[in-house]
Amino acid sequence: VTGHEAKAVQSEIGKALEEEMRFDQQLSVVYNRDYQEGQGTSVALGTRYLAPESAACFFIPGDQPFIEPLTLREIIEHWEPETIVIPLLGGRRASPVLFDRMFYDDLSKLTGDLGGRQVIMKHESHIKEVEVSGNNPFQNFDLDTPDDYEKALREMSEKGH
């Protein structure tokens, strides 16, 4: 789901697909014209575009580009029907969260800037927290500006990542 700078983001997605990424499934890029109303609107829109047969879904924040595939696999390994799987890094909740299809209806109605946290708060009894290996200390860096990105790259280089 794109919003701000949608054309630039879509262009970069296209480049990545051509150069290095391979997907076994179809990838859809959806523009959220209401993106300024908060990330909840993007989560809601994305949920409405999920394949009907999907069992669960991640919402991976676009401003956290260092989330590792290993983290995704570890989260998926702990998924069970009717759960919300939240990764922990060093005991702290992190991204991305894996939502079972049971929560799609709630997710599709989100508004505001809390995003999936609204659904998490509503369904505490369905939460499964999982400590993930998190080999990359930068995987939950929140990059909101080009300066944040440059700083993260410098720090990663200094630490040998």
Regions found by a protein language model. Name each.
Residues 53, 107-110:
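A polyampholytic, Gly/Pro-enriched intrinsically disordered region
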Residues 62, 94, 106, 138-139:
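Short, flexible active-site loop motifs that bind/organize anionic cofactors or intermediates
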Residues 72, 103-107, 149:
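A generic structural signal for short hydrophobic patches within well-formed alpha-helices
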Residues 95-99, 141-143:
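Short glycine- and hydrophobic/aromatic-rich loop-to-beta-strand nucleating segment
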